[in-house]
Amino acid sequence: MCIRDRFHGYTYSGIPVSVAAGLAVQDIFEKDDIFNRAKNLSPYFQEGLMSLKDIDVVDNIRGYGMMGGIDIKMHKKPGAAGFTCFKHCYDAGVNFKATGDCLIIAPMFICEKKHIDEIIEKLRTGITNYSKSKKN
């Protein structure tokens, strides 16, 4: 729908089925205490991310809650290192968003410690493989 000079909404906005789905999701988040589960797991996730600092191509790691960013040292031109590192991580079995030379990691709120361990292990493999490929 249009409101004067601004576009507002999407094709699914305000449709009863979409509203019902949104309310159902909110009920599940409340019933299963999803946000508190994520809050309790976030220190473990952040600790896992920080454990990757020892890899030589990692420039900086930062995070908050269940979200983290890993800056990969720039190589030749901006964005190239991040994209190439992302491909190595994807080949190692982990998928996420890479923007420029930053790997953005945001696990599902419903994950468990074993999933965090798997994510960190695959990130370590992918980033290490990227580092080795630079040396060849």
Regions found by a protein language model. Name each.
Residues 4-136:
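Conserved N-terminal phosphate-binding loop of PLP-dependent enzymes in the Aspartate aminotransferase
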